[in-house]
Regions:
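Short, structured "edge-of-domain" segments at secondary-structure transitions
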Residues: 29-49, 108-114, 126, 133-139
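HKD (HxKxxxxD) catalytic microenvironment of the phospholipase D
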Residues: 48-120
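Short proline/glycine-enriched turn/loop segments at secondary-structure junctions
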Residues: 77-78, 130-132
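Short proline/glycine- and acidic-rich turn/helix-capping motifs at secondary-structure junctions
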Residues: 120-126
Length: 147
């Protein structure tokens, strides 16, 4: 997505991290969440992809064991969008569409040309893909499913 600034959503993401949920977020622009902070957000990573185009997909992939729920939507998680606008989010149930979205997320996560990773102080450093842990993705993440 483009931005994550809504304090209520951020608090819920922190709570999920504290409960042990692994979370990967791909946020193009403003992100008010701080990843990798001890006892707060140790299970969260934030990747920013800055390319030639102002592209930012709003794909939400939730996974628990082998159960995946995938959604696409129109809103960035900003207070003005969630509280004062009409936005839409819809589930993706078609397996072929899910597969295509998974491939897209893999492409984003593996990108090491346009990607930056947010450090726990809010600064960014150039991202180098590693086979470790888009959008919210609970454990295991798309990286865990690579072969």
């Amino acid at each position: 997505m483009s931005s994550l600034v809504d304090p209520e959503i951020i608090e819920l993401i922190y709570l999920a991290s504290q409960a042990g949920v692994k979370i990967s977020l791909i946020i193009r622009g403003v992100c008010c969440l701080y990843p990798q902070k001890k006892n707060l957000s140790e299970n969260i990573e934030v990747i920013s992809i800055i390319g030639h185009f102002l592209e930012h997909s709003r794909i939400f992939w939730f996974r628990n064991d082998n159960n995946s729920e995938v959604f696409i939507g129109s809103a960035d998680w900003m207070k003005r969008n969630l509280d004062r606008r009409i936005e839409a989010v819809t589930p993706i149930e078609d397996l072929e569409l899910k597969s295509q979205l998974f491939t897209l997320l893999q492409t984003y996560i593996k990108d090491d040309y346009f990607s930056w990773i947010m450090k726990n102080d809010g600064s960014y450093e150039k991202y180098r893909f590693k086979s470790a842990t888009c959008l919210l993705y609970t454990s295991p993440s798309p990286r865990d499913e690579q072969s």
